[in-house]
């Protein structure tokens, strides 16, 4: 059963969409089936030199149904890896 989660970060404009996709996919290749960017924005309410990037992650386990806790854990991992690697901030 597939699970979808959306994330949005404010990130330095030097990072490409491809770099973010690659970074997230590497977190758990068995579980993360797809990462799709659905919005990139620069302008009002975003600091100069930064951009907002929003993406959807598809989780699809092969051997079990994900519990809410499993989903929370992988979501927290995605957030921490993106923040630690790029200095991004989570956008609410």
Feature map (PLM): residue ranges:
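A carboxyl-terminal module marker
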Residues: 1-92
